[in-house]
Swiss-Prot record:
One of its GO terms (cellular component) is cytoplasm. This is Small ribosomal subunit protein uS19. The lineage of its organism: Bacteria, Pseudomonadati, Spirochaetota, Spirochaetia, Spirochaetales. GO terms for molecular function: rRNA binding; structural constituent of ribosome. HAMAP family: Ribosomal_uS19. InterPro entries: Ribosomal_uS19, Ribosomal_uS19_bac-type, Ribosomal_uS19_CS, Ribosomal_uS19_SF. NCBIfam families: rpsS_bact. It comes from Borrelia duttonii (strain Ly). One of its GO terms (biological process) is ribosomal small subunit assembly.
């Protein structure tokens, strides 16, 4: 179920303050966050935000195409190593 429009997008307060502080600077600073549930807003465009995946911080460069998505969508928490191999070929 989608979030109500009158509530607006969710973004953690500390992350929002860091975004506003770094948007006026010329030097690009990587912002680290644990908030995977925060929505990407237009003020974040052209910033690099490192999102924690449970093990390390994954840098995500924000473009206009990513606005409206959640930060956690671009920081996978699980590694897929493939399905189990079948040993039937080697048994004969």
């Amino acid at each position: 179920m989608a979030r109500s429009i009158k509530k607006g997008p969710f973004i953690e307060k500390s992350l929002y303050q860091k975004v506003l502080a770094s948007s006026g600077k010329e030097k690009r600073v990587v912002i680290k966050t644990y908030s995977r549930t925060s929505t990407i807003i237009p003020e974040m465009v052209s910033l690099t935000i490192s999102v924690y995946n449970g093990k390390s911080f994954i840098p995500v460069y924000i473009t206009e195409d990513l606005v409206g998505h959640k930060l956690g969508e671009f920081s996978p928490t699980r590694i897929f190593r493939g399905h189990a191999k079948s040993d039937k070929k080697g048994r004969k």
